[in-house]
């Protein structure tokens, strides 16, 4: 006997609901059903909290073309690997799944901005949601910039199907005047702003920088050792 359930998300007009108390049927009911049925699966929102995964179950974050579409929780014989997993789906490619064991033994996050390597990697969002960025750090021989930000620094280039790679051009502590000066000196007027792990809003940053040149650039706003930094990069993969 097996079963599946897709709890409805509570309606909110302002922001996404992440509380399991707001879904229907309730998370308690879903777990109760799973305790009675040998094989159960539940499809939940990508914001499913890691700590809510039942003992022995598999919480699988799934992405399609880089966007996380769901977190599926599996019980009993439907479990392929207990714990947190990430499955990446892309057109024309086989599904790729990472597990917690793939991330074990990763180096700790960078201790300073000076330790930043020549390449910045950004894993698929399912990998980040599942908390498995360490798998990328291990693969490329690098380290996450700060705990939980999702960016990985490494010294060497490596093509990873489930990650984007950027060449680091410059990096500095976040300071509007300093970043504006660096960009203006290179005639940058069109700026792609990426961010992870910081509260800065890209459009507000764009207004503060007041750029007017004809060149293009990309900046990643993130954290290193708890400090907000700006990393200027060129897309490489």
PLM regions: where:
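SAM-dependent transferase fold signal centered on methyltransferase-like domains
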Residues: 1-237
């Amino acid at each position: 006997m097996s079963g599946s359930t897709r709890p409805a998300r509570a309606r909110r007009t302002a922001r996404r609901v992440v509380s399991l108390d707001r879904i229907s049927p309730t998370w308690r009911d879903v777990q109760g059903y799973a305790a009675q049925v040998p094989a159960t699966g539940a499809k939940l929102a990508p914001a499913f909290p890691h700590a809510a995964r039942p003992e022995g179950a598999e919480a699988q974050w799934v992405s399609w073309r880089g966007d996380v579409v769901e977190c599926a929780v599996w019980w009993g014989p439907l479990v392929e690997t207990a714990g947190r997993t990430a499955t990446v789906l892309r057109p024309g490619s086989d599904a790729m799944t990472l597990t917690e064991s793939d991330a074990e033994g990763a180096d700790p996050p960078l201790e300073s901005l000076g330790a930043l390597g020549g390449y910045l990697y950004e894993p698929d969002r399912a990998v980040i949601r599942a908390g498995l960025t360490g798998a990328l750090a291990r693969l490329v021989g690098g380290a996450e910039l700060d705990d939980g930000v999702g960016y990985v620094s490494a010294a060497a280039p490596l093509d990873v199907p489930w990650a984007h790679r950027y060449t680091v051009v410059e990096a500095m502590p976040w300071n509007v005047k300093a970043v504006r000066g660096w960009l203006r000196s290179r005639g940058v007027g069109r700026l792609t702003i990426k961010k992870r792990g910081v509260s800065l809003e890209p459009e507000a940053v764009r207004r503060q920088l007041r750029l007017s040149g004809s060149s293009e650039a990309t900046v990643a706003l993130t954290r290193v050792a708890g400090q907000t930094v700006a990393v200027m990069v060129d897309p490489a993969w």
